[in-house]
Structure formats: C-alpha cells, structure tokens
C-alpha cells in the first residue's frame, strides 16, 4: 500500500483503485497462510475482530493514498467508505477461495469491480488530480 505510485500515470481515481487492488491481490496470492487467515470464513471471534481492525487501518491508509493523488469530495463521517469497499471486495475474493482454493483471475476482476462500484457511490467519475510536490 505504501509503495510508490507514479502520479503521472494516473488519469482517474479508478486507475489508482486498480493499482491498489492489484497490490492487495499480489499479497493474497503470494502467501497462502495470509490468504486463508484474511479471506477464509472462520468462527474465531478474535480473528474476525483483528481482521476488521486491519481493514479499518488499511481503509485509512487507502484514504490517505487517494487523497494524495486526487481532490476527494466530502465523505461520510459515520461510514469508513474505503474500509467498507475493501471488505466488500474481500468477500468476493473469499468466495473464490472457498470455491477454488485460490483467487481466480475471473473472481479477482469481480472483486475489483465490487470495490470500484462501491467507491463510485461516493467518488464522482472525474476527480481533480492534485499537483504533487517532489518528495525531499
């Protein structure tokens, strides 16, 4: 999530969304134990709570990344839009793991579509890009 993103290559927020989701998929695909822990449905309350907290933290990071590159509109205070978008996409990935023991390319695409569809309820199609100052 914190790896550099080439700001000049971004045209719309959906470009950034795709980069972020592809990075998350790479993590899930590279580590079977993490994939099972994060995506498998399990009955352990402690694990579910830890997973939810992890999603909230990632949601905050994702908001910061999007806000760095685009001029975001006002978002609701009572719903963590980015965390919820990620959780919804994760449900699609989890379904793929349940059915196929992996995230198939088709279900990866569907998960990204769900992520974008939910964010699209809050982010207009065209967002102004920020002018990034060089990092020192």
Language-model features and meaning:
Residues 10-14, 18, 48, 79, ...:
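Short, structured helix-loop boundary elements
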Residues 12, 31, 100-104:
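Helix N-cap and loop-to-helix transition residues
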Residues 10, 26-37, 41, 48, ...:
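Hydrophobic alpha-helical bundle segments that form small-molecule/ligand-binding pockets
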Residues 3-7, 37, 44, 68-72, ...:
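General structural signal for alpha-helix termini and helix-helix connectors
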Residues 49-51, 101:
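Short, solvent-exposed loop/turn segments at secondary-structure boundaries
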Residues 26, 60-68, 82-136:
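C-terminal peripheral helix-coil segments that are non-catalytic and often amphipathic
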Residues 2-29:
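Hydrophobic alpha-helical connector segments
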């Amino acid at each position: 999530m914190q790896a550099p993103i080439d700001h000049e290559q971004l045209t719309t927020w959906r470009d950034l969304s795709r980069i972020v989701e592809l990075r998350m998929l790479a993590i899930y695909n590279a580590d079977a134990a993490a994939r099972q822990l994060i995506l498998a449905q399990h009955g352990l309350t402690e694990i579910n709570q830890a997973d939810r907290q992890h999603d909230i933290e990632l949601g905050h990071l994702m908001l910061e990344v999007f806000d760095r590159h685009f001029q975001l509109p006002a978002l609701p205070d009572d719903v963590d839009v980015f965390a919820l978008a990620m959780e919804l996409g994760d449900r699609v990935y989890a379904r793929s793991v349940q059915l196929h023991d992996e995230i198939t390319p088709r279900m990866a695409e569907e998960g990204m579509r769900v992520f974008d569809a939910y964010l699209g309820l809050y982010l207009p199609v065209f967002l102004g890009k920020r002018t990034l100052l060089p990092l020192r």
